[in-house]
Structures are given as structure tokens and as C-alpha cells.
């Protein structure tokens, strides 16, 4: 009886490992589209104005379900090569169609209207991530 229980345990452990490996391989093979947005704000933009913009951008993943992942941050590089760009927003999509739909989505368009009065420069780069 102990032998049967032990073998059943080994079988379950093997299945668990097999499923985990299969899931990991699946994730590795599925490329994602990164949408990187960098902002430089006009001199008249106050900390409150910038905070409003940060909050509006951070709200987009809750309003647009096509966003697969989202990160953001403020430049802290000691290299001083940012050319005035201070904020980076990193948005991940599963497809170009998802990205294209996001760009014309009413929530994204509303965000752009909040941003416009305070934006001096934007740099946007989209790429397919390679591992």
C-alpha cells in the first residue's frame, strides 16, 4: 500500500513539473509588443500638473483591457543623457492590433487631451520583445 501511495505521489509530482515546464515554454514562445513612451514637460508644468498626468496614464490599464502589462517611472540616470525626458511609461500588448486599438481608444484620447497643455516633447518607440 505504501508503495502505491509513493508511486501516486511521484506521478502527481511528475505531472506538476511537466505542466509548469509546458507553461514556461508557452510564455517564452509568445512575443509581446512593447510601447515605450517618454515625456518632457514644459517649464510651466507644476508638480501637481505632472502628478495629474501620471495618475491619468496609470489609470489606462483599468480602462483599456487590451493592455497586457504596464510600468512607469521617473528618470534617475546619472548619465544625464535624457535630453529633458523625465517620465517613462512602458505598455505591453499581445498584438499590433491591440496596440492600434489602444491608440484610438476613447480613454487614451482623453489622456492625450490631459497631457497636451503640459507636453514639450514625446518620444515613442514600439518593438517586439526578444528573449
Residue ranges and their predicted role:
Residues 1-25:
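Bacterial Sec-dependent N-terminal signal peptides
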Residues 16-85, 94-101, 127-131:
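Short S/T/G/P-rich N-terminal loop/turn motif that feeds into the first structured element of a domain
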Residues 46, 104-108, 120:
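Amphipathic alpha-helical protein-protein interaction surfaces
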Residues 58-61, 109-112, 119:
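A common structural junction motif
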Residues 118-124, 131:
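C-terminal partner/receptor-binding element of secreted or periplasmic proteins
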Amino acid at each position: 500500500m505504501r508503495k502505491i501511495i509513493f508511486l501516486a505521489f511521484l506521478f502527481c509530482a511528475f505531472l506538476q513539473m511537466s505542466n509548469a515546464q509546458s507553461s514556461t515554454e508557452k510564455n517564452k514562445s509568445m512575443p509581446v509588443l512593447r510601447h515605450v513612451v517618454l515625456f518632457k514637460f514644459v517649464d510651466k508644468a507644476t508638480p501637481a500638473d505632472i502628478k495629474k498626468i501620471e495618475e491619468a496614464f496609470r489609470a489606462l490599464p483599468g480602462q483599456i483591457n487590451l493592455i497586457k502589462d504596464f510600468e512607469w517611472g521617473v528618470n534617475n540616470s546619472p548619465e544625464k543623457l535624457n535630453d529633458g525626458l523625465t517620465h517613462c511609461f512602458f505598455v505591453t500588448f499581445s498584438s499590433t492590433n491591440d496596440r492600434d486599438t489602444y491608440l484610438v481608444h476613447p480613454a487614451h484620447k482623453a489622456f492625450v487631451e490631459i497631457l497636451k497643455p503640459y507636453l514639450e516633447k514625446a518620444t515613442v518607440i514600439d518593438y517586439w520583445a526578444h528573449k
